């Protein structure tokens, strides 16, 4: 009886650790990418670029952009760190540099009036609109978003972690990117009503709060990269 009770406690504890690791990786990925991707801010640009299309065509484009954005972010997160390492750049250095970039992006979002990955995109006008260019890149996923994804992908535990821990973090990161893709689709799908509901002040508040979280994540990534760098043999 007592043995079965302890076994149940161990199973519950293991399950909670698994959920905590997945939730932590999910929150890190989503909170790091959302302020830069910021589909709520990009939604009016999307609506302006697709204003000549029917509602059905606009919805189809929103779905394609979400899928393309998911593929770009996932590719940057998975392959980006190893491509840099292939060129002889150590991953801890990549983490430090990426952390500086993330912190700088967060600071710009927090202090400047008009700065984002969508800078320079026209709010209206007519141009040939494609699901990849310009709607996916650079309107939705630009260089800032991709650099954040690479930095998050390079954030690894020192040493050789167990396979279960790797699987949990990969699952959480994947869910985070899926959540970003869903926010892209929903923001673009309801772009015509979102700006009217939130208003300029609502979008401003959301961006500033997200920017502060992004700065904290950037500083934490810098510290992890520095800790890993000084631990390497010279």
Predicted features and spans:
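Structural signature of hydrophobic alpha-helical transmembrane segments
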Residues: 25-42, 91-101, 172-184
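Short, strongly hydrophobic alpha-helical membrane anchors
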Residues: 2-24, 158, 228-234
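A small-residue-rich subset of transmembrane alpha-helices
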Residues: 55-81, 156-195
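Membrane helix-loop-helix hairpins that form the core translocation module of multi-pass transporters
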Residues: 59-113
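Transmembrane helix exit motif
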Residues: 100-122, 217-228
